[in-house]
Amino acid sequence: MVGWKLVVLSILPCLRADTCKCVPGDAVCWPTETALNAFNASLPGKLIQNIPCATIQTNWNSSLFHAWFPTGYDYSYALNCDIPGGNTSSCSLGDSPYYAVNVTNANDISLALKFATQHNMRVAIKQTGHDFLGRSTGYASLEIWTHNLRQGLTFHDSYLSTSQCSPQEPEGMESTGAALWAGSAITIGGAYTWAEVYQFAHEQNAIVVGGTCTGVGAVGGYLQGGGHSASMRDFGIATDQVLEYTVVLANGNVVTVNACSNTDLFQALRGEAVAPMELSSTRPSKHSFLDAVATWYETTPMILEANLGGYAGWAAWDGDTLLAPKVRRLESAFGGFNRSVDDIQESMAPVVAKLAPLNSKGMNIMAEYIAFPDYFTYFHDVHANSMNVGQSIIMTSRFLRSTQLINSTALRQMVNVTAGLPGQNAFTVVGVNGGGAVALDVPNTTINPVWRQSLVNNLVARNWPDTAPYLEVKAAQDDITYVKGASLESLAPDTGTYINEANYKDPNYLVNFYGTTRPTLEAIKKNYDPNDLFYCVTCIGSNYWYQQANGPLCRKDS
């Protein structure tokens, strides 16, 4: 019996090296102490071994704190245990990376990728940890931690790429008079947050298209997922703005990627005045409030037709929601560039007129019109947020076309389901910023085309305290996946999902996330990463792998 065990153990590491990513204890592939020391010396001294530590308890709800640590993640549902937590009596690394490289330049990244390849290690990449899907972590992985890769922000009055190339302007976009973009640009030299980039752009009297959560990294998953913004209706999706990347490939080579150099990779990386309104109930009637919410959805095409864009949030029950009102209310804020208050008010008159009858049905409709001196002030006063972290959250989202937004019956059914029940902490965030520049046929992108065809992105989520028992957590996950998410998909079966604010448990994620772009993206990944060094949950190519419980990542065809 002992001899049989020894035979199995001696064969298993060899099989795992071919079919699974290496994990601690694999004698054949896991790096020895000598190899690790040599690797650390080559960096030099930037290799970190991650060890669970109870002292993080006091800073668990700080996004900035999580950003400063290689295993700090804003939303903890994907981790092995919550701190302070109610589901575990002890804490281990779980799915967090085993080692991290504190990279400060491209050469560090190159060395890390080559080391991971040599030892068949899983690779994770993390900047700030603002990640709803668990894409920046991985069991027993080597993490490339980019938080301290900061080589400056540079403003260019007139852009010229390193390869004398710029993407062509899409037809219909205001032209500079040249066939290629030659206007102003900003080089973001590494791991800067949107808060830092916004401030820098403001000092240059410029506007950048970026996220509303200002602690999010400006370069990374936000742009690769597309990136929605308060200014996108006027300027386009965030990834449309990218002129050039400097990229470290899976083989460790550093290359320039733009519309003339490595164009297929450039295409893949570009993938994926104000009028606030408030709608609240003066008596505790869920039914009348949801009628009003459904009517409000019907006004969103009118808001966009008035050349305004922005966001709304609503909740049907009092609760501790993360991103929406904590009482029964719908709040929204929409802005327009170079518009007077009188002009905005006149443009919004049809919207107000459609909502006004709700005042006689127990609703309280309020509209306020405010002028701001510049976009920077407007954005920070109205839209910018740091978002409370350290709680667990699961969400789903759906793009809605105009046809869905005028279907009163179907809208009311969706609103009733997504509103949820008391105690669920269910809430909805609505991005009303489609059309305009978003709808332009921009070249060299692999954004899901349904985004450009849609007017609204509707996000539904639930969050729960870290002391929630496992069965309660599982119920919330199933509710978002099979009830609320299914309701959104029933309303808009032919659209898709914004992949950065999505459900990592979505059983149909390949279609919902990528749509018709999937074959193109898979071909590009195979070309640049034939051995699948890069993997993340729900990312392109992830369907060919499976994660063992508390174990390695393995190929499905094994």
Predicted features, each with a name:
Residues 1-18:
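Fungal secretory targeting signals
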Residues 2, 18-558:
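Soluble FAD-dependent oxygen oxidases
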